[in-house]
Curated annotation (Swiss-Prot):
Homodimer. Interacts with ATG8 through a thioester bond between Cys-616 and the C-terminal Gly of ATG8 and with ATG12 through a thioester bond between Cys-616 and the C-terminal Gly of ATG12. Also interacts with ATG3. GO terms for biological process: autophagosome assembly; autophagy of mitochondrion; cellular response to nitrogen starvation; piecemeal microautophagy of the nucleus; protein modification by small protein conjugation; protein transport. The C-terminal residues 721 to 760 are required for homodimerization, as well as the interactions with ATG3, ATG8 and ATG12; and the C-terminal 17 residues are required for the ATG8 lipidation. The GxGxxG motif is important for the function, possibly through binding with ATP. Disruption phenotype: Blocks the autophagic process. Leads to fewer aerial hyphae and slower mycelial growth rate and fails to produce any conidia. Also reduces the production of sclerotia in cold environment. Fails to infect wounded cucumber leaves and shows only slight virulence on wounded tomato and grape fruits. Its main location: cytoplasm. A motif (GXGXXG motif) lies at residues 436-441. NCBIfam families: E1_like_apg7. InterPro entries: Atg7, Atg7_N, Atg7_N_1, Atg7_N_2, ThiF/MoeB/HesA, ThiF_NAD_FAD-bd, Ubiquitin-activating_enz. The keyword Cytoplasm applies. This is Ubiquitin-like modifier-activating enzyme atg7.
């Protein structure tokens, strides 16, 4: 094969038609090849066309590979607080809504870092709520789509998601809006799934990059700027940024302006440096208004802040900038400034300068001119694989913080779908005083914690006995040894062991009881004052003691202080759960009665002369937890009502569909349903009844006479009530009621006697 044939073959192959070549091709093409003399000698050393073809292809591929641009991709870097912020946003606001949300990304040139640690896209803890850009950083526009299930994450059409994100860049370039938001050129998208029970976060970043076709290639690589040039450029750029939106800071135009004899440099604006030119910075939009007019090509720079520290590889966002250069600027050759300097080290030049060229040939364009080009951008992991990343936040979190979030999680999930109007803070912030730390008190406290209540105080005077742990869930066997731990102290400690975030304390004291004479006035008064202070300091008072008389004083105090008073009492297979009525704001009588409103006698000593079965709380084991759960749920319902403790009892009305009487929900949108006054349970029949009882004006505990006397005289009133047997009965009016009842009974008996006499001895007329 003679030399001209080799020349023709070489020219044909290197003209991008090699895929059409066969040995029998007979085409008239140029006689001169692209090789010089030394290369001609090399060509003639091949004996066959096939060998030459292979050699030329390899040589050309290597040559193109050397001059082709390789871009340093972004790597994601998420601060731990961001995961917490994303969790809170999902739980408290987004719930089931998985619409994409804006997120702020940041990057910066880090000259001191190794190349593999550069090009970091940082997402700070406040990225979901803040647009603040720290000094030295460049902003990037991001979106995060936090889906509801891991299946949604796996099944997401990731190519379509990437295409949608890239189309936003493409459209902004074509319609010119990119000039207002140049930071869109470095935009990113996050697909994520937050497992809020296990505190694991699965996520995948995409940094959409539009491909240029044909690809841009390095024509040459000019030398770096001098230290003086870099210093002047950095100072001029810093001045320019002060007057421009931070979304423009990452992309700009730069030019060297030399003074001419026709236009000498203004002395006032003359640079203090010894450079023969002045740097001028402009926005990307200024290209179309003639920013580079009259400026030599070697002094024109289309620039971007480059986070890459690779010596020859620019940052990922240059891909999109080059698409803008071709689409908006109509350039096929451009000088790119990969700006890598910062103000602190402006005397050490780091920036990379590239002269790039891309010859547009419509014959070999794979897509239509107005069609979005090929898009890539999903992030690879440390092994170079296209796959998602998983972060386990539990290993970084303080266990107490984990417990805080876990306690609230189930409650907040109620608001996602079932009860969106539920006011959890109203329950969580309610300070609860539990009078009694026994069977009822221990169950109630656990259920209050389940509702998220953070402040629980116990009052009890007893110690843990060996019969308690099986029925009282806060105690165990070791609490019974050596006489038994005090219930109030041990119960509060147990709550903190269960959940360290609860504020629980215990007070060992005996509640002064009606019918029990004072044996130590100083101690009794001290207990009275402590109880009075505790009731003032709490919002909801639970009466969970063993006797009726022990509930009397807290009932009086709670009514006088306007507190929510919750009461539960147990029988063998029955229970009563109720809320006490509160005094209305107008000062009138309470609409609903208290625990004592149905009594016609004042409480008295009920433990005197009791046998063993009467001294112990003998109930079916399931009664206490059932009553406790009803009591806590009743409090939750009360706190959701607009009137809180003054909520009226539900009323019966006829259901138009069933024709049966049903209680009306008041208000109709109450998230938890009814707010009954009393619930009476009958375990033997497995039924409950909702009962409403009005307040009684002669009640020994909540009647105006009793409450007013307590408010006026305080301890003196209580002292007299405990020492004078019939004082409360007389003051409340119950004694008069009893006398009238006796008189009425006597009248009935007398009338019966008279009628009998008349029958025996009829009067003669």
């Amino acid at each position: 094969m003679n030399l001209p044939e080799y020349h023709r073959l070489a020219a044909y192959i290197t003209s991008d038609h090699s895929q059409d070549y066969t040995q029998d091709t007979n085409v008239a093409f140029i006689e001169e090849g692209p090789w010089d003399g030394e290369e001609e000698e090399l060509i003639t050393s091949f004996s066959t066309v096939e060998d030459l073809y292979t050699a030329i292809c390899v040589r050309e591929d290597n040559n193109q590979l050397d001059m082709a641009l390789k871009f340093a991709p972004f790597a994601s870097e998420i601060e731990l607080p961001f995961y917490t912020a994303l969790s809170q946003l999902k739980i408290d606001h987004d719930k089931l809504d998985d619409s994409a949300r804006p997120v702020l990304g940041l990057y910066e040139p880090r000259a001191t870092q190794s190349p593999d640690q550069s090009s970091r896209m940082r997402v700070l803890g406040n990225a979901l709520s803040s647009n603040e850009v720290p000094s030295g950083h460049i902003r990037a526009e991001g979106k995060i789509k936090n889906v509801n299930t891991i299946e949604d994450f796996k099944n997401m059409d990731k190519q379509a998601m990437l295409q949608t994100s890239a189309k936003q860049i493409w459209d902004a370039i074509n319609d010119g809006t990119i000039y207002s938001i140049p930071s869109l050129l470095s935009s990113f998208t996050i697909l994520s799934f937050a497992n809020l029970k296990k505190y694991t976060f699965t996520y995948w970043f995409a940094f959409p990059a539009l491909h240029s076709e044909p690809a841009w290639r390095k024509v040459e690589q000019p030398p770096k700027f001098s230290a003086e040039e870099t210093t002047a450029l950095t100072e001029e750029l810093g001045t320019w940024r002060y007057s421009h939106d931070n979304r423009e800071h990452g992309f700009f135009l730069a030019k060297r302006v030399y003074p001419s004899s026709e236009h000498p440099q203004d002395p006032e604006s003359e640079s203090t440096s010894d450079l023969p030119f002045k740097w001028v910075i402009g926005s990307l939009r200024e290209f179309e208004s003639g920013f580079f007019n009259g400026v030599d090509a070697k002094n024109q720079y289309v620039s971007f802040v480059d986070p890459s520290t690779y010596h020859e590889n620019p940052g990922w966002m240059l891909r999109n900038l080059l698409v803008l250069v071709r689409r908006r600027y109509k350039l096929d050759k451009v000088q790119i400034l990969c700006y890598r300097d910062n103000h602190a080290k402006r005397h050490v030049p780091q920036s990379l300068i590239l002269i790039l060229e891309s010859i547009y040939d419509p014959e070999y364009q794979s897509t239509a001119p107005d069609q979005i080009p090929k898009v890539t951008g999903w992030e690879r992991n440390s092994l170079g694989k296209l796959t998602a990343k998983v972060t386990n936040l539990a290993q970084y979190m303080d266990p107490a913080q984990l417990a805080d979030q876990a306690v609230d999680l189930n409650l907040k999930l109620m608001k996602w779908r079932i009860a969106p109007e539920l006011n959890l803070d109203a329950i969580k912030n309610t300070k609860c005083l539990l009078l009694g730390a026994g069977t009822l008190g221990t169950y109630v406290s656990r259920l209050l914690m389940g509702w998220g209540v953070r402040k629980i105080t116990f009052v009890d005077n007893a110690s843990v006995s060996f019969s308690n742990p099986v029925r009282q869930p806060l105690f165990d066997f070791k609490d019974c040894i050596d006489g038994g731990a005090k219930k109030a102290y041990r119960a509060s400690e147990a709550l903190q062991e269960i959940y360290p975030g609860v504020d629980s304390t215990g007070h060992v004291m005996a509640v002064p009881m009606l019918g029990h004479p004072i044996t130590d006035e100083a101690a009794t008064k001290m207990n009275f004052e402590l109880l009075q202070k505790l009731i003032e300091d709490h919002d909801a008072i639970f009466l969970l003691m063993d006797t009726r008389e022990s509930r009397w004083l807290p009932t009086v105090m709670g009514k006088a202080a306007g507190k929510i008073v919750m009461n539960a009492a147990l029988g063998f297979d029955t229970y009563v759960v109720m809320r006490h009525g509160v005094t209305p704001e107008d000062g009138g009588p309470a609409a609903l009665g208290c625990y004592f409103c149905n009594d016609v006698v004042a409480p008295s000593d009920s433990v005197k002369d009791q046998t063993l079965d009467q001294q112990c709380t003998v109930t079916r084991p399931g009664v206490a937890p059932e009553a406790s759960s009803k009591l806590v749920e009743l409090l939750a319902s009360v706190l959701q009502h607009p009137l809180k403790g003054a909520a009226p009892a539900p009323k019966l009305s006829s259901n138009h569909q069933s024709g049966q009487l049903e209680f009306d929900r008041d208000p109709p949108n109450h998230p938890l349903g009814l707010v009954p006054h009393q619930i009476r349970g009958f375990l033997a029949a497995y039924k409950t009844m909702l009962i409403s009882g009005p307040s009684y004006d002669c009640c020994s505990a909540c009647s105006p006479k009793i409450v007013n006397a307590y408010k006026e005289d305080g301890w003196e009133f209580i002292k007299r009530a405990l020492t004078e047997k019939d004082y409360i009965t007389e003051l409340s009016g119950l004694a008069e009621v009893q006398r009238k009842a006796e008189a009425a009974a006597n009248d009935v008996e007398w009338d019966s006697d008279e009628e009998g006499m008349e029958d025996e001895e009829p009067e003669l007329l």
